[in-house]
Design a protein with these regions (language model features):
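Glycine-rich, aromatic-bearing surface loops/beta-hairpins
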Residues: 128, 136-190
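Mid-chain, well-packed structural core segment of small domains
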Residues: 115-135
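Histidine-anchored nucleotide/phosphate-binding helix
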Residues: 58-70
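Helix-adjacent hinge/juxtasegments
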Residues: 96-120
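Short internal beta-strands
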Residues: 74-80, 146-150
Length: 190
């Protein structure tokens, strides 16, 4: 920590930066348990978001991120630009939101075996969502959960013919039916 220079910054900012660096080091040290190994967590979770045409997607995504984080998962959001932007604007201080990436980039990284996840939650309100869920089931080792919603959710559920856990409800503007269906499955439980 010594020897750092803070050109053009006041003393208060310097001391805050040094305090923050020391605090981060302390927190990293706390992550090591008695055996010297980092603590185990349930793992990582990918949330796949498509076009945010149906209003419930953003609120359910934030709710799911919160539940996953409380259970020890590290959630990552992969969506199109509109879906990602809605989440970033809804949570500007990143209280819930962590890593956010482009959906096509996430698919490429998983396909190239550069990254994978333990759980994958695909938000579905149209045929494209079903295609993404099938793709994730084929390229990833993750356990796939499909969140099917919208006016015609029942027709979409009938099209799912690949292994996954289906969470479905008629939810367009009111997220509570989908939240209830999600809570019944508790996909964040280890």
């Amino acid at each position: 920590m010594q020897g750092k220079s803070f050109p053009g910054q006041c003393k208060k900012a310097q001391s805050y930066c040094l305090w923050l660096e020391k605090w981060n080091y302390t927190k990293r040290q706390e992550l090591v348990n008695l055996s010297g190994e980092p603590p185990t967590s349930p793992g990582s979770a990918l949330l796949v978001l498509g076009c945010p045409q149906v209003p419930v997607q953003t609120s359910i995504a934030l709710y799911l991120i919160n539940r996953l984080k409380k259970s020890g998962f590290v959630p990552v959001v992969a969506g199109n630009k509109a879906a990602n932007t809605l989440l970033v604007i809804a949570d500007p201080d990143r209280h819930y939101l962590g890593e956010v990436m482009d959906l096509d980039r996430a698919v490429a990284m998983i396909t190239d075996k550069k990254r994978d996840f333990d759980r994958c939650f695909v938000f579905i309100h149209n045929d494209a969502g079903i295609s993404y869920a099938a793709t994730m089931g084929a390229i990833s080792r993750a356990k796939v959960f499909t969140l099917v919603y919208g006016e015609h959710y029942d027709e979409l559920v009938k099209q799912i013919d690949f292994p996954c856990t289906i969470i479905a409800a008629k939810a367009v503007h009111n997220p509570l039916p989908l939240k209830k269906a999600l809570d019944e499955v508790t996909p964040w439980a280890a």
